Structure formats: structure tokens, C-alpha cells
Amino acid sequence: MAKDRVYLFDTTLRDGAQTQGVDFSVEDKRLIARALDKLGVAYIEGGWPGANPTDSEFFSEKPALKRAKFVAFGMTKRPGRSAANDPGLAAILDAKADAACLVGKSWDFQVDVALGITKAENIELIADSIVAAHKRFGEAMFDAEHFFDGYKANPDFATQCVKAALDAGARWAVLCDTNGGTMPDEVERIVGELVAKLGSGDRLGIHTHNDTENAVANSLMAVKAGVRQVQGTLNGLGERCGNANLIALIPSLMLKPWFRDHVDIGMSEQDLTHLTATSRTLDELLNRAPNRHAAYVGASAFAHKGGLHVSAVMKDPRTYEHVPPESVGNTRKILISDQAGRSNLLVRLTEAGIKYDPNDSRLNLLLEDVKQREAEGYSYDGAEASFEVLARRTLGQMPEFFKIRSFRVMVERRFNARGELVTISEATVKLNVDGETLFSVAEGNGPVNALDHALRKDLGRYQAYIDDLRLVDFKVRILNGGTEATTRVMIESADGQGNRWFTVGVSPNIIDAAFVALMDSIQWKLLRDGAQPSK
């Protein structure tokens, strides 16, 4: 059976840039565009030329894309102006792009209140603008803003807006759930009705927002109902609650039975294996920790903790996994916790590359130690590096790179020379490396920061291994109430190549807990990078 072609349209660089706290540079946009092109999307919307200096510069030279078309976004001409005499439209038409996507109203309420013009005038704005864009680029698209709200209020007018764009030469008329409030059953019904009116959905697209956590579901239902273009963003970036997440949509369209059998999104199985890396590239660029629980690509998406689950997964992964993790470039993780059985432990050791004898009595000691530590507050299911350090130490496979003799942290609150009240933290660390005693003193913006700097200030001959080590996240959880509470500290570290790992420490003293986690982080990196202790 021939499959229907569905085209992926990425708007990370335009709609995704509306995310609170996100501000792409021109170089950021170029990097993301290359990643999207490698992934295999059909269209990359680069931004709004003329709206800001960044987008104007980005569109001054078309990026060298091998697979995707480069799209300029903008709005239809303003009321009272011709298409040839509208500065905003002119900036879009001057852009170095392969196509243009113009947004316009399709809800009569918006036409009356926001534009203050007649419905006929709005239809004219759409048609004239699309004609101009089609003449300039050869491919024009119309984003029907508020289409679903407009259709529910006045289906005839919303349909007229879509038809006006298509009749004017638009390759695509994209149905936008701009406010994000439409439900999946409504999307399926409305798209189905529109497809029936037009006779085909081959020139229709869908653009959804995630205000009810239904953006992906709404997009899938629209495809089932007949649209052939799907818009979204990497990791669901977008204004308010975000847009449809292409990272979740792509594998669903490729791997889930109905979509796999009926549509072709122009991506290969090999392309799909780049999905996890693409998602994490964006997070790294934004300096954000990846969402561990993200569908398909999260670190926990294929993580198994319960002993019964692990035993079954090792026999056949289909028992607890809906798709193979490697199909999306992810990996399976077997977690260690107080629920862990021996099977979990052995699998986790194998994954970490730790050699063991199944008859080694120290394996039982390790399992009991893990359970005891978790009872005290440790959590190894999210701190794989700390688990590996503990396991290797118990099994006699952890080198002793250095010894900490003592550390001290002081916090002083005083007035500085300018009469300002400041709080200063200072840490001192005394350690032995190859029999030599080293002292390090460092200040920080807090006691943990100062201790981190002091630990990494001078490790003798190991210093080169940790020069690119940095602490990127620090989480504290109070495990029981009161001033004598036990504290758990979880630290996320990273290196210059973007690799990240997690370590954990527990103590009634928050500084001591942080010290344990910091020590595990440093020792794990030395181990991973092949540092060798003196004989």
C-alpha cells in the first residue's frame, strides 16, 4: 500500500525562540539549522526577517542546507496597504529563503477586535499577500491563526480564509490551534470536515500549542484526519506552554503501527537514531539540563528499577519497552536502588563495564551496602557515577588517586572596604598525591562553591584531567524535619565535551554531603579518562 507523504516543518528558530528565557544568537540558529537538516525535516523556519537584527542577519545569507527548505516567516500585509507598499512584507520578500510562511487571521472575532476591518478585507489581505510571496519564492504558506477557535465560532468564514490562501497559490494552509485549548476529538472532527469540504488534505498542515498537554496528540489526530504537513519544535519549545514536540512526534509517526503503515515523513531509520543527540544538542546550547523523563529521548525513558521488571526486560525487552531504545538513539538503563535484586546489580555492573565473578561474595556485600545506603537517604537510580565508584571500591577495582587529609569551610559576613555588607565563603583542602601533601585555598559565592573550587584547584599530576570539569547543577533535599535533619545533595557535573554525570552525598551536614558528591564526581572522571595512580 502506497503511503501518504507527510512533511515535517520545524519552527524552533521562530516559535521556539518565543520561549521564556530563550534567546538565540545568529550562530545558535546556524548550529540548530544544521542539526535539523541532518535529522531530516522538510522545512526549517528560521525566524522573522525585519522583526529584529538577529533574524535580519540570519536571512541575509541562506544557510547551506542539504535536505531542508529554508523558510522566512512574517505576517500578511497590513490593512490599508498594498502588497507592494508594505514594509513588513517587503522585508520577508527580500529574505534569502526558499519559501515564505505568512500568518493571518481566520477567526472573525480577531478580525473584528484586533484588526478592526471587515471579513472581506481580511480575505483580501490573505490573498494579495500569498500571491506576492508565491511570485517571489515559488512556494508560499499560510498560517491560519486561531483557526480552530475561528472554525468553532464561524466555520464558513474560517474555511473561506483557508480557501483564499489556497486559491491564491499557497502550497500549504496550516491550521493553527493558537490558544492551545482545542481537544484531540475536536481536532479530528474539524480537520475531517475541512478535508471533506476541500476534497483533500494534501495542502493542509497542523500547528498546535501545548496549553492542555495535547499538542502532540492533536497533531497526530490531524494527520489521521488528513493533513500532510506537521509543524513543531525541538523539545517542545514555544510560547507559554510550548508547541508540539517534534522529538515525540517524529518517532510516533515512524514507529507506531497506524502511522508507520500509512504515512512517510521522509526520514530513514538511520535518521531516527539521531533523535536523542539532536534533543540533547539543543539542551546543551541552551545550557539546560535535559528532561530525564522526556518521551523517547529522556535518560529515564528506558530505565528500569523494579527487580521483576528488570528480570523480564533481560529476557525480552518488549515486556516493558514500547520501542527499542536504540531506534531513537537512546540506551536502556538498569537502576540500582533498595528495590534492586541481584539481576539488577549484575546488569548494571555490565553496563558500567565492570568485570566481576558471579560467585564473588563481595557482590552480596555490594547489594546490601546499596540497600543500606538508600535506607539512609542515598539515591543511586539518578546518580550512576556514584554507584560506579561505590561498586568498584567494593570489588577492589577503584584506584586511590589521592587522599583527603582534611578540609575546612568558613563563612564570614562582614562589611567590605566600600561599607557594603557581604558574605564570603572560603574553603581549605589538605590532600596527599603520590606522597606529597598539597594545600588548596579558594573562595566562592557559597560554601559548596568554595569547596568545589578548592578541591579542583591543585590535584598535582592529575590536574590536567579535571581542568574542564565543572559543576552545572546542585540540588539539596532535606530528608527529615528539624535543624538536625539529614540532607541529600545531588550534583550534576560536565566536561568540555558536553558529557554529564550525576553523583550523590548524604549527611546531617550539608557541606559534608556536598563533599562526598564532589569527591565521587572527581574520582569518576579520573577513572573514566584513564588516569593512572603511581605504583
Feature names for model-found ranges:
Residues R5-V6, D10-T12, P251, P257-V441, ...:
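A mid-to-C-terminal "edge-of-domain" accessory segment
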Residues N499-S534:
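Mixed-charge, glycine-accented linear interaction segment located at domain edges/termini
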Residues H207-T233:
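Small-aliphatic-rich amphipathic alpha-helix that forms the alpha element of a beta-alpha
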Residues K3-L8, R14-I44, E57-E61, L65, ...:
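Alpha/beta enzyme core
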Residues V22, W48-P49, R78, K119, ...:
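Hydrophobic alpha-helical scaffolding
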Residues Q18, D23, L31, L166, ...:
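Non-catalytic terminal/interface segments that mediate subunit docking, oligomerization
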Residues K69-G74:
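A glycine-rich helix N-cap at a beta->alpha junction
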